[in-house]
């Protein structure tokens, strides 16, 4: 469920010297499964991800289009057979390019089997399981195309470990943002391994 939240100060309290805000929420969407991130356009269009389902968009008129799903999902215009979810891993961050109105570019962080190679047999190997995808969004907001995997080797945790909440996919990162300079910033999780933030050759446990 996604909410719109409005803060407003109570007039009587404000008049008495207290400025205590109250909160009003309205359900914008219901029935979602593990919604993870949102990216807004100036007109109110909202791209959003569901961790184990995929990428969708809520248009400024309120209609919803399912754009790009994960393996075995239904109802999406297209799907990536290499994309999967497990624990805290799945389709996570989404952000629109700063010049989206000109280039129609969208970035999405997801977990993928495409670049695993032979490195995912234990939690102590370099398991390249998280990627950043770049898409072009159609002008009618009904489909995405030209998937390009621009980051392919952010490490993923394939097996359970003895840490609290230590299942597969734990500490998976996934946040995407565009900075003031127009650069794309990517957060990779530490996958429950202290070596990740300390080893400069690994992308896990880093802000890229």
Residue ranges, per PLM feature:
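Bacterial N-terminal signal peptides
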Residues: 1-5
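Acidic, Gly/Ser/Thr-rich repeat motifs that build Ca2+-stabilized beta-propeller blades
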Residues: 11-195
């Amino acid at each position: 469920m996604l909410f719109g939240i409005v803060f407003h100060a109570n007039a009587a309290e404000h008049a008495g010297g207290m400025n205590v805000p109250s909160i009003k929420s309205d359900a914008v969407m219901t029935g979602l499964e593990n919604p993870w991130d949102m990216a807004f356009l100036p007109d109110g269009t909202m791209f959003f991800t569901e961790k184990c389902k995929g990428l969708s968009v809520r248009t400024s008129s309120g209609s919803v289009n399912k754009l790009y799903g994960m393996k075995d999902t239904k109802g999406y215009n297209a799907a990536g057979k290499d994309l999967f979810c497990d624990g805290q891993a799945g389709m996570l961050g989404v952000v629109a390019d700063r010049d989206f109105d000109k280039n129609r570019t969208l970035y999405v962080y997801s977990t993928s089997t495409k670049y695993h190679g032979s490195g995912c047999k234990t939690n102590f190997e370099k398991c390249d399981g998280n990627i950043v995808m770049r898409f072009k969004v159609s002008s009618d907001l009904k489909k995405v195309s030209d998937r390009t995997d621009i980051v392919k080797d952010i490490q993923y945790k394939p097996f359970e470990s003895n840490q609290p909440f230590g299942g597969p996919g734990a500490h998976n990162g996934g946040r995407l943002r565009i900075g003031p300079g127009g650069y794309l910033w990517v957060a990779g999780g530490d996958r429950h391994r202290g070596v990740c933030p300390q080893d400069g050759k690994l992308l896990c446990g880093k802000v890229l």
